Amino acid sequence: MIALVMFLIDQGTKYLIASRLEMYEQIPVIGNFFLITSSRNRGAAFGILQDQLWFFIVVTIAVVAGIVWYLRKMTKEGRKLLPTALALVLGGALGNFIDRLLMGEVVDFLQFNFGSYTFPIFNIADSCIVIGVGLIILDTILDGRREKLNKLNTSREVSGTEGNE
Protein backbone atom coordinates (compact mmCIF):
# COMPACT_ATOMS: atom_id res chain seq x y z
CA MET A 1 0.00 0.00 0.00
CA ILE A 2 2.86 2.40 0.85
CA ALA A 3 4.53 1.66 -2.49
CA LEU A 4 1.30 2.34 -4.39
CA VAL A 5 0.58 5.59 -2.54
CA MET A 6 4.11 6.91 -3.08
CA PHE A 7 4.05 5.85 -6.74
CA LEU A 8 0.77 7.72 -7.27
CA ILE A 9 2.02 10.85 -5.48
CA ASP A 10 5.23 10.75 -7.52
CA GLN A 11 3.45 10.31 -10.84
CA GLY A 12 0.83 12.94 -9.98
CA THR A 13 3.40 15.58 -9.08
CA LYS A 14 5.46 14.80 -12.18
CA TYR A 15 2.37 15.11 -14.36
CA LEU A 16 1.57 18.52 -12.86
CA ILE A 17 5.12 19.74 -13.43
CA ALA A 18 5.45 18.40 -16.98
CA SER A 19 2.04 19.67 -18.07
CA ARG A 20 2.09 23.12 -16.46
CA LEU A 21 5.69 24.32 -16.47
CA GLU A 22 8.08 24.96 -19.32
CA MET A 23 11.47 23.28 -19.13
CA TYR A 24 13.62 25.04 -16.47
CA GLU A 25 10.74 27.28 -15.42
CA GLN A 26 11.00 28.02 -11.70
CA ILE A 27 8.50 28.75 -8.96
CA PRO A 28 10.06 30.04 -5.72
CA VAL A 29 8.50 28.30 -2.71
CA ILE A 30 10.80 29.54 0.07
CA GLY A 31 12.80 32.42 -1.38
CA ASN A 32 15.86 31.15 -3.21
CA PHE A 33 16.24 28.22 -0.78
CA PHE A 34 13.49 25.94 -2.18
CA LEU A 35 12.17 26.17 -5.73
CA ILE A 36 10.01 24.06 -7.99
CA THR A 37 12.10 23.80 -11.17
CA SER A 38 10.97 21.80 -14.20
CA SER A 39 13.88 19.61 -15.27
CA ARG A 40 14.57 16.27 -16.96
CA ASN A 41 17.24 13.70 -16.22
CA ARG A 42 18.35 10.94 -18.58
CA GLY A 43 20.68 9.45 -15.97
CA ALA A 44 20.67 8.53 -12.30
CA ALA A 45 21.29 10.54 -9.15
CA PHE A 46 23.51 13.57 -9.71
CA GLY A 47 23.28 13.00 -13.48
CA ILE A 48 25.52 9.92 -13.58
CA LEU A 49 25.06 7.24 -16.26
CA GLN A 50 23.39 9.59 -18.75
CA ASP A 51 21.51 7.93 -21.64
CA GLN A 52 21.83 4.39 -20.23
CA LEU A 53 18.10 3.64 -20.61
CA TRP A 54 18.36 -0.14 -21.05
CA PHE A 55 20.73 -0.44 -18.11
CA PHE A 56 18.18 1.32 -15.88
CA ILE A 57 15.30 -0.77 -17.20
CA VAL A 58 17.10 -4.08 -16.57
CA VAL A 59 18.39 -3.03 -13.13
CA THR A 60 14.97 -1.69 -12.08
CA ILE A 61 13.19 -4.88 -13.15
CA ALA A 62 15.67 -6.94 -11.12
CA VAL A 63 15.37 -4.65 -8.07
CA VAL A 64 11.56 -4.58 -8.22
CA ALA A 65 11.38 -8.38 -8.55
CA GLY A 66 13.76 -8.81 -5.60
CA ILE A 67 11.85 -6.37 -3.42
CA VAL A 68 8.47 -7.94 -4.21
CA TRP A 69 9.85 -11.41 -3.44
CA TYR A 70 11.43 -10.21 -0.19
CA LEU A 71 8.32 -8.28 0.88
CA ARG A 72 6.22 -11.42 0.49
CA LYS A 73 8.71 -13.25 2.69
CA MET A 74 8.78 -10.42 5.26
CA THR A 75 5.01 -10.34 5.80
CA LYS A 76 5.25 -13.81 7.32
CA GLU A 77 7.88 -12.66 9.83
CA GLY A 78 5.86 -9.79 11.32
CA ARG A 79 8.58 -7.16 10.88
CA LYS A 80 7.57 -3.52 10.39
CA LEU A 81 10.51 -1.21 9.62
CA LEU A 82 12.16 -3.22 6.84
CA PRO A 83 8.93 -3.81 4.86
CA THR A 84 8.15 -0.08 5.12
CA ALA A 85 11.64 0.78 3.88
CA LEU A 86 11.40 -1.68 1.00
CA ALA A 87 7.95 -0.38 0.06
CA LEU A 88 9.37 3.16 -0.16
CA VAL A 89 12.21 1.96 -2.40
CA LEU A 90 9.71 0.00 -4.50
CA GLY A 91 7.37 2.97 -4.97
CA GLY A 92 10.28 5.23 -5.91
CA ALA A 93 11.86 2.71 -8.26
CA LEU A 94 8.56 2.17 -10.05
CA GLY A 95 7.94 5.92 -10.32
CA ASN A 96 11.24 6.58 -12.06
CA PHE A 97 10.95 3.34 -14.07
CA ILE A 98 7.64 4.44 -15.61
CA ASP A 99 9.17 7.80 -16.56
CA ARG A 100 12.13 6.12 -18.24
CA LEU A 101 9.96 3.55 -20.00
CA LEU A 102 7.41 6.06 -21.35
CA MET A 103 9.58 9.14 -21.92
CA GLY A 104 13.20 7.97 -21.87
CA GLU A 105 13.91 10.39 -19.03
CA VAL A 106 12.84 11.24 -15.49
CA VAL A 107 10.93 14.40 -14.51
CA ASP A 108 12.74 16.22 -11.68
CA PHE A 109 11.47 19.35 -9.96
CA LEU A 110 12.57 19.75 -6.33
CA GLN A 111 15.46 22.20 -6.12
CA PHE A 112 17.27 23.31 -2.96
CA ASN A 113 19.94 25.99 -2.80
CA PHE A 114 22.34 26.37 0.10
CA GLY A 115 24.01 29.73 -0.40
CA SER A 116 25.86 29.46 -3.71
CA TYR A 117 25.50 25.64 -3.80
CA THR A 118 22.58 24.16 -5.74
CA PHE A 119 21.73 20.59 -4.75
CA PRO A 120 20.93 18.41 -7.81
CA ILE A 121 17.24 18.66 -8.72
CA PHE A 122 15.25 15.56 -7.74
CA ASN A 123 11.69 14.23 -7.40
CA ILE A 124 9.40 12.38 -4.97
CA ALA A 125 10.55 8.96 -6.26
CA ASP A 126 14.17 9.86 -5.53
CA SER A 127 13.16 10.95 -2.02
CA CYS A 128 11.36 7.65 -1.44
CA ILE A 129 14.42 5.69 -2.53
CA VAL A 130 16.81 7.68 -0.33
CA ILE A 131 14.52 7.53 2.74
CA GLY A 132 13.88 3.82 2.11
CA VAL A 133 17.61 3.06 1.89
CA GLY A 134 18.19 5.08 5.08
CA LEU A 135 15.53 3.01 6.86
CA ILE A 136 17.10 -0.21 5.55
CA ILE A 137 20.42 0.87 7.08
CA LEU A 138 18.66 1.75 10.35
CA ASP A 139 16.90 -1.63 10.37
CA THR A 140 20.21 -3.40 9.77
CA ILE A 141 21.79 -1.57 12.72
CA LEU A 142 18.80 -2.28 14.99
CA ASP A 143 18.65 -5.91 13.87
CA GLY A 144 22.34 -6.32 14.68
CA ARG A 145 21.73 -4.96 18.17
CA ARG A 146 18.74 -7.27 18.63
CA GLU A 147 20.86 -10.25 17.63
CA LYS A 148 23.59 -9.27 20.09
CA LEU A 149 21.02 -8.91 22.89
CA ASN A 150 19.47 -12.28 22.01
CA LYS A 151 22.90 -13.97 22.04
CA LEU A 152 23.74 -12.30 25.35
CA ASN A 153 20.43 -13.37 26.90
CA THR A 154 20.79 -16.90 25.52
CA SER A 155 24.33 -17.26 26.91
CA ARG A 156 23.14 -15.97 30.31
CA GLU A 157 20.28 -18.48 30.32
CA VAL A 158 22.63 -21.33 29.38
CA SER A 159 25.22 -20.39 32.01
CA GLY A 160 22.47 -19.86 34.59
CA THR A 161 21.00 -23.28 33.86
CA GLU A 162 24.37 -25.01 34.11
CA GLY A 163 25.13 -23.36 37.44
CA ASN A 164 21.90 -24.67 39.03
CA GLU A 165 22.52 -28.33 38.26
Task: Map each language-model feature to its residues.
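Alpha-helical transmembrane bundles and membrane-interface segments of multipass inner-membrane proteins
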Residues: 1-165
